[in-house]
Amino acid sequence: MSDLNISRDGHVQVIEINRPPHNYFDTELLRQIADACDVADADADIRSNLLCANGKSFCAGANFTGKQPETPAERRADSRRLYDQGLRIFRGKKPIVAAVQGNAIGGGMGVALAADFRVASPETTFSANFTKLGFHPGFGLTVTLPNLIGPTKASLLFLTGRRVKGEEAYRLGLCDVLATTETLRAEAMKLAREIAESSPLGVKSTRETLRLGLVERIEEQLNRELDEQSWLRETEDFAEGIRATAERRAGNFMAR
């Protein structure tokens, strides 16, 4: 089974994540998404991208199953490779509309916020749950989330790790269109087509102006996020956060 289903709808490239039910990501999945964005950038006939997912969740976060790096240095290098692929998505030149169903949790929320626009439903759940894991936000969220909803509301979501349902997400500005679960993808496609109907040169020029310096700022902040995640990953609190999440209970954190 492929990790992505790629198709075309007129001038829209459809990038469907295909790791159901929860579409956890890793470096390889991000590489494939970035490659698809590169294809769009090189093809003048593609004017926008629709990023969606097959399954219950849009993306419920990073994949922690399977063999993990054994040493702190290896874990840091592994995270560096992952973020390098994520940065490639931010560098894409064509607009991305994300159809966000189910959960967009942790790094999965970061993937959703890498898009230019998000379409969600009342049942969609966003959560930057990093502090609930004894961890630090990643995937450039310390840039993208405050940019969307302001620094105070972003701090509230980061420091509490609270879950935000679709209607509140719409009020906050986390999503741009609120649709029913049944019409979510169709509404996202409608927006992607609307963008594709505009002048490609005008869209490219305007988007570049609006995003001036954004990728460079995300790259700088990713380095900070990686530094913080690297030392926090070695703490007892992080181990407790992972256990508590797996056991569906509150963490008993000891600040060590």
Where are these regions (language model features)?
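Crotonase-fold acyl-CoA enzyme core
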Residues: 88-203, 226-230, 234-235, 239-243, ...
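Conserved CoA-thioester-binding segment of acyl-CoA-metabolizing enzymes
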Residues: 1-54, 87, 91
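Short strand->helix junction
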Residues: 22-23, 57, 135, 177
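Terminal peptide-recognition signature
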Residues: 15, 33, 51, 63, ...
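Short, structured helix-loop boundary elements
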Residues: 30, 72-79, 181, 185, ...
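Short, charged, surface-exposed hinge/linker loops at domain edges
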Residues: 207-216
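Glycine- (often His-adjacent) and acidic-residue-rich active-site loop
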Residues: 5, 31-32, 52-88, 104, ...
